[in-house]
Amino acid sequence: MKQTKYIFVTGGVLSSLGKGIAAASIATLLKNSGLKVSILKADPYINVDPGTMSPFEHGEVFVTDDGAETDLDLGHYERFLDESLSQDNNFTTGRVYQSVIEKERRGEYLGKTIQVIPHIVGEIKDRIKKAGEGKDILIVEIGGTVGDIEGLPFLEAIRALRLEVGKNNAMNIHLTLVPFIKAAGELKTKPTQHSVGELRRIGISPDMIICRSEKALDRDLKDKIAISCGVEKNCVIESVDAASIYQIPLNFLKQDILSPIAEILDLKNLKPNMENWDSLVKRVIAPSNEVKIAFVGKYVDLKESYKSLTEAIIHAGAALDTKVELKWVDSEKLENMESSEVFKDVSGILVAGGFGYRGVEGKIKAIQYARENKIPFLGICLGMQLALVEFARNVLKLKDVNSSEFNEKCQNPVVYLIDEFMDTNGEKQIRTAKTPLGGTMRLGAYKCDIKEKSLLAKVYNEVKSVKERHRHRYEANPKYRADFEKYGLIVSGESKGLIEAVELNCHPFFLAVQFHPEFTSRLEHVNPVICSFIKAAINYEDN
């Protein structure tokens, strides 16, 4: 297949309907039909990337192998496709304008007046084409909702691109809400009709409509939507609330979603093999066992902030045929609570990453309880750094211990800001406490060398090194390494002198890692760190 074919996914009525899940589900079916598939997310907001956005604004920032800070939908794409994506798979209005302005400053436009059409729209089209190079199919999700002023250049770009590549090489899928009105006792199609009307005014006619709803759509309702929105009857697909997002590809397959896609894009033999996926989904929905772990974090009121981590726990549960119940513990509130009361009914304690001092002492309290009571413990990113702080305070008995992130003048900064590091391209990066925040962290996949015969080595099946993804500014201070190891806190993973993992040698499972194992976990290939922690929690409960 020479010409890359495009599937453009837009959304209407309101945001957060699940365009990303729908796009990822279609991609999964196409990939399992033997096609080379990739996905791109185009975000209309003006931030260059979500790296400096609050979790309460944006949810999780997902990090790719090459260090791009991206939309959380890229996490869904990777988990469904079981492939690693890159910075080419996500861009924003801010990134587009930044690129165009830089080209203008370099004189690349030869003195022309820079306009939305053709320059901004052209940049968007170029980025879409680049993401699709070497692929049979590129699915392009346009963030936001049709009607948003920010999204107009993106919609113009996909309208123009479809015209450019020809009708058999591109299609438009529009995802809308079909709300159930309890007072009337029926589903209403009017919001969908209005949304499609708005899309048509922009110059785009959808080829397929995916209807998000609480309840199933009957045949008459689907026919009504097809007639009023100008699509074939087999191109109205329902997406009813499901027990798990991993059911969605299977639900789409049952509705024969690939037949109209194959017809529109002139594809043949789309018969996906979803047997393994189906088996895992059954374990997600109806597992044989159950275990409860405490999830200690500062953003527990907005669980989207930990999306990759909660999904990785689901993956581990599926692999172990176990439902993992999460007990959400607000680390800030924990500071004034009794640890024994909070953790009395859990079989594992997970301390997640985060930024800023709020809730830090609560996380340290949770780590101390896990260490002293020999409850399986996993610390991630800040969770590892605070494990060092807790150990230095309560085992080494050092005074005025902290991370320099929270107290620059403390006597014993067991975690500190390093001035120089090598990025994923092997280039030296220099930073200080005054360096701008955007894009200045240690980002992306780095090699971690593993200590032989350690818990970490056992977790990774005795391999000598692994690559995992990072997102942090501060590092463990090597000055204290000898003292930590003397008292039993062993460095079991390192990267060019930087401490990547620590573990306790007199504890059933106490592991803390600087990297984010959740970013590389997929339903069909769970990350070993997450899986081993859940397995340890199951063993703790059994014993």
UniProtKB/Swiss-Prot annotation:
Coiled coil: none annotated. Keywords: ATP-binding, Glutamine amidotransferase, Ligase, Magnesium, Metal-binding, Nucleotide-binding, Pyrimidine biosynthesis. It comes from the Bacteria. It is an enzyme of class 6 (ligase). One of its GO terms (molecular function) is ATP binding. CDD domains: CTPS_N, GATase1_CTP_Synthase. It catalyses: UTP + L-glutamine + ATP + H2O = CTP + L-glutamate + ADP + phosphate + 2 H(+); L-glutamine + H2O = L-glutamate + NH4(+); UTP + NH4(+) + ATP = CTP + ADP + phosphate + 2 H(+). UTP binds at residues 15, 188-193, 224. Residues 1-267 are annotated as: Amidoligase domain. Mg(2+) binds at residues 73, 141. Residues 292-543 form the Glutamine amidotransferase type-1 domain. GO terms for cellular component: cytosol. Allosterically activated by GTP, when glutamine is the substrate; GTP has no effect on the reaction when ammonia is the substrate. The allosteric effector GTP functions by stabilizing the protein conformation that binds the tetrahedral intermediate(s) formed during glutamine hydrolysis. Inhibited by the product CTP, via allosteric rather than competitive inhibition. Homotetramer. CTPSs have evolved a hybrid strategy for distinguishing between UTP and CTP. The overlapping regions of the product feedback inhibitory and substrate sites recognize a common feature in both compounds, the triphosphate moiety. To differentiate isosteric substrate and product pyrimidine rings, an additional pocket far from the expected kinase/ligase catalytic site, specifically recognizes the cytosine and ribose portions of the product inhibitor. Catalyzes the ATP-dependent amination of UTP to CTP with either L-glutamine or ammonia as the source of nitrogen. Regulates intracellular CTP levels through interactions with the four ribonucleotide triphosphates. This is CTP synthase. It comes from Campylobacter jejuni subsp. jejuni serotype O:2 (strain ATCC 700819 / NCTC 11168). The lineage of its organism: Bacteria, Pseudomonadati, Campylobacterota, Epsilonproteobacteria, Campylobacterales.
